[in-house]
């Protein structure tokens, strides 16, 4: 069954509806207590003190039943104590299996929380007891609990949490988890005596093995713990948390205290600069020039085009105050710039000689999304380029639309090695107020489609509203034809999701901030000068060829640590070498995309780097092409369509092209999901686009859903 409260936004809405004060902070996933304590020590919440972060356990009793415990993070949870408190045999209390977490609470391991009780069915409520640590109510004003996912924390008064759960039909057992009677302590001491002796013997054996292993190391530093660098979540098991780990541990982003807003660090911003440079050259070649327009838009201008503003209205952020004074009327922060640019276009254009007007700006945009934010993919503030052009004819505008769409395809496929589908949006999915919308769509490894970029033919709708007109060669007044098009930092999220693996990022060479890292292996001071000298020599050779290279000769970490760090950051090629390699006049190449190693002669390093950068780029693209091909279903009927969606595929279907049919498909999928008890049943879907590269539509083909004559093939999928 679908969770009633699947994410932090649903919890935030519930707390708002109940008028319960709270603060929700976003951060990297805090799957265990130590990183959580470290994080909140550095980034304390703005809440009433004293406050404390909580640990949450979901336990099962072998004799029957489950317990969810919320306690102060420093409360010691002894399962023997719990057995006595819950009046069951020693050894009966243990952690619930992953499957039970999913079935009862709708969470993954590492994300157990008190709010997840709200997802229990009436029958499940009879099986689960909730115990709230007495310490929380007696000592703390505010407690921190993950709101369904440990990538954010909700700070709330413990009494408010208690009342909320009681209002929703739960008995809240306020329990002293440290409570043990004297007789029990004596019994425990007897029981524990042998156990402690056994543990001591095991520890001594373990320590002996560790010492033996350490003594065998040639380098005292080689036992350096590199586990903290690794990605804890598996891409194929927990995609969302894997993604969060990738982009934070690789230093692409940092979280900010306003939900949906993120700090882009150099490792991601430099990728954006590569994309910007690539696309900027292309649009300038066809005559587009860069502008910079204001961030703010007046209420009057924004509401001038009714259909347009209705499409963005829920996402518009308004400035309503200046100091203590009210701003009347309020000023909007641009969700897009049509209504800012077009009054200026109307002033600048008088004659056919002023056309075409081809404008672009690289800027930031604010859209106050209410959906669950995902860095780079769905955020409240993001970087983008937005192009706006004005033409004398429909055909000129149409040519511009498809020229830009091809540029966008090239950004994704040729630069980022991410395959996309070029196509036209349906009437339901097109840009509000436009004539038609074209798009490029991608398929992510989690089975979701993603709108990668859009190019819109606006027709004359906006030129009518803003009186963008010109005198033609015969001195007749004509309304102009317009286009708008945009590409965002979503590109970064897409390439991370497509190419990344369980070691971290895998960056396409063309956008990687660093394409090659050189890591020397020094075993003694005797050969350090020779080793470092050769590394510097290779570094200078590659730098002369405009290859983005770094030489990691730091003594702070071992080679093993450096390997893990640069693999996490996704650098395409690592060159590693030591004294033995140099004696053979060679180095070792490591390719990040397929994890292969091979020797390369010193005299061939530069040529081999160039060759491998090109090979890796092509290999990464082909790997994704093959993945998408294997994740595509062609369906002629609704059952096959649904089967494809539930596999995480995109689905090509013959379709009647009717908007009401599209709506009916969405409603039917949602209805089926609401009645299904299968965890993997898809609850939502949409048309991604109608591909420009159409399969052959045989005469007499029917719409896969309504049975009317099919007019076109559409691509459907789940989507961000």
Cite the ranges covered by each PLM segment:
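NTP/phosphate- and nucleic-acid-binding module
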Residues: 1-720
